[in-house]
Regions:
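Conserved hydrophobic helix-helix packing surfaces used for dimerization/oligomerization
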Residues: 14, 190, 296-298
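C-terminal effector/interaction modules appended to NTPase cores
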Residues: 1, 19-25, 203-392
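Conserved G1/Walker A P-loop phosphate-binding module
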Residues: 1-78, 82, 86-89
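Conserved C-terminal guanine-recognition region of P-loop GTPase G domains, centered on the G4
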Residues: 52-60, 65, 75-148, 178-182, ...
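G-domain G4 guanine-recognition motif of GTPases
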Residues: 67, 97-101, 118-135, 149-158, ...
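Canonical P-loop GTPase G-domain recognition
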Residues: 115-121, 126-182, 189-191, 220-229, ...
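Short, flexible loop segments at the rims of nucleotide/cofactor-binding pockets, characterized by
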Residues: 41, 70-76, 98-101, 169-171, ...
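Long, well-ordered amphipathic alpha-helical subdomains in the mid-to-C-terminal portions
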Residues: 183-209
């Protein structure tokens, strides 16, 4: 992703669901105007999730996701279906392609989507070659409680209807969240203290830093940045103390001890706890750390799938802090990317990263899973603040 692109995590996620060879790939190609998904008459051509970022007038940045057919068979088919089901967790709006009156698989997916309160747009494709489109549309309406859009992806018929339907189904709260909330307003001075360690390769800032700076500029704040070792010098160079200081969780304690009394302090990870997740549940769950014992089991979940670094926060620094507090025998498991367990009951606590690479819907679905299983879940920044004795 370039610095001028909207991160996929901030885009409206529109997922196409349907049977094999129902025309999902053709439709995503028609919607995006590009041949990004392989099209074939052979069922099961799409073997993994295929995504395409684009802009839709009136909506803004979107991410279309093409899924494998949910009627796939065999061992490989089961793997494809599991990936399709995982896609539901990150879906903001679903396009459900319907084929005929054998509606068994469609009903299953429809029930899952409704359970997650995901808006559904039923679509009847291939009207250019069907003879019973109206009859089938009536049947689909009875099943979905909404009239399907009649289209032909191949002939580009009805594509604009889908774009309009997406606009109408846009969740009312989509895009309303912002990183810094009500912490700052126009003309406030904000200082970002950003340690440039091995996790931030030379010539690059990490995504949370980039997104936060951009938002602060949009809010017309006065934005200053410095590295940890230049924090004191930067404060001395300023005419007034910053209204807000934002730093990395790993240096939170050091910055807290040096900051002006009138300056508020938070971390990128704490900000992203509210931006992507449920900050109240995270804070409530962090208190569980006090009750952990060496026989407890903790799950640390990382959104990224990068190769582990020598001082990685999730794999090294956070486990070190936990074992220092709880004991060396504390069992800690690590998962990355989409490998998040369905069953969380073996764990006393889940600690998630800031999830800058995930959309809000995906993070909230993980929180919902933890809540349903009565498992506390917090994130890196909140956990580190608790372990360091800082609740700010």
């Amino acid at each position: 992703m370039s610095l001028t692109d909207t991160p996929n995590a901030n885009r409206l996620h529109i997922t196409l669901f349907g049977r094999r060879n129902s025309g999902k790939s053709s439709l995503i190609n028609a919607l995006t105007g590009q041949d990004i998904a392989l099209v074939s008459n052979t069922p099961g051509t799409t073997t993994d999730l295929v995504s395409k970022a684009m802009e839709i007038q009136g909506i803004g940045p979107c991410l279309f996701i093409d899924t494998p057919g949910f009627d796939d068979e065999g061992e490989l088919g089961e793997l494809r279906i599991s990936r399709t089901l995982k896609a539901i967790e990150k879906t903001d709006i679903a396009l459900l392609l319907c084929e005929d009156t054998t509606f068994f698989h469609e009903k299953e997916i429809l029930a899952l989507l409704k359970e997650k309160n995901i808006p559904v747009i039923p679509v009847l494709n291939k009207i250019d070659i069907r003879e019973n489109s109206d009859h089938l549309a009536t049947y689909i309406e009875e099943q979905c409680k909404i009239h399907p859009l009649l289209i032909s992806a191949k002939e580009k018929i009805g594509i604009e209807l889908i774009r309009q339907a997406i606009l109408e189904k846009l969740p009312s709260d989509f895009g309303q969240q912002n990183i810094t909330g009500k912490l700052v307003t126009e003309n406030d001075l904000v200082l970002l203290v950003m340690p440039q360690d091995i996790q931030a390769p030379k010539g690059r800032l990490i995504l949370p830093q980039v997104q936060t700076i951009r938002e602060l500029l949009d809010k017309k704040c006065l934005v200053m940045t410095c590295t940890t070792d230049k924090f004191s010098a930067t404060l001395q160079a300023l005419a007034r103390p910053p209204k807000l200081i934002i730093t990395d969780s790993q240096v939170f304690k050091a910055i807290y001890e040096q900051k002006p009394a009138e300056s508020e302090l938070t971390s990128f990870s704490v900000l992203f706890a509210g931006y992507k997740g449920d900050i109240h549940y995270y804070v409530e769950s962090a208190a569980v750390i006090e009750r952990l014992t060496e026989s407890s089991r903790v799950l640390i979940a990382e959104a990224c799938t990068h190769a582990p670094l020598s001082e990685d926060i999730g794999r090294v620094k956070l486990p070190r802090l936990l074992r220092k507090r709880i004991g060396e025998n504390l069992q800690i498991d690590m998962v990355a990317g989409t490998d998040f367990p369905q069953d969380l009951t073996p764990y006393s606590l889940v600690i998630h990263c800031g999830a800058c690479m995930f959309n809000r819907k995906y993070v909230l679905s993980r929180i919902e899973r933890a809540r349903e299983q009565h498992i506390p879940m917090t994130n890196y920044g909140v956990a580190i603040a608790f372990l360091n004795g800082n609740s700010g």
